[in-house]
Amino acid sequence: MFSHVMVGAADIEKSKKFYDAVLGTLGVGPGVANGTRFFYMTKTGMFAITKPINGAAASSANGGTIGFAAPDIKTVDAFHAAGLAHGGMTCEDPPGVREGAAGKLYLAYLRDPAGNKICALHRMPKT
């Protein structure tokens, strides 16, 4: 459905260190530089961080979340720990299981150094 997702960051180098760490836990290589942007590419899509091209301050979306798929609970926990170790802040509830319309999920939420809300999500098997 999506070709890419891009978020703004005032301190692009700080954000790159954060995303290199958290996305590295998911098997994604370091961000590739292109001007004032860094791109993280996989076979299924692309994530990018950028300084806003209009020169205005970067801001995070109120109510917005970007979710990254994780293959297992251990990876979700590693994603969360890497984020905290690289300038992220925990938000929402601690990492753990949530149940709802989407089924049983193991989730961990963070705010990146620019304030963008992200999460790692593992869909748990139906029992």
State the predicted function of each range.
Residues 7-47:
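Core segments of cupin and vicinal oxygen chelate
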Residues 1-17, 66, 124-127:
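N-terminal beta-strand motif that seeds the catalytic metal site of vicinal oxygen chelate
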Residues 10-14, 68-114:
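Vicinal oxygen chelate
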Residues 51-54, 97, 123-126:
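Acetyl-CoA-dependent GNAT
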Residues 32-33, 92-93, 124:
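A generic structural-conservation signal
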Residues 41-85:
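Long, continuous compositionally biased terminal/linker segments
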Residues 39-44, 110-113, 123:
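Active-site beta-strand termini and strand-to-loop segments that position acidic
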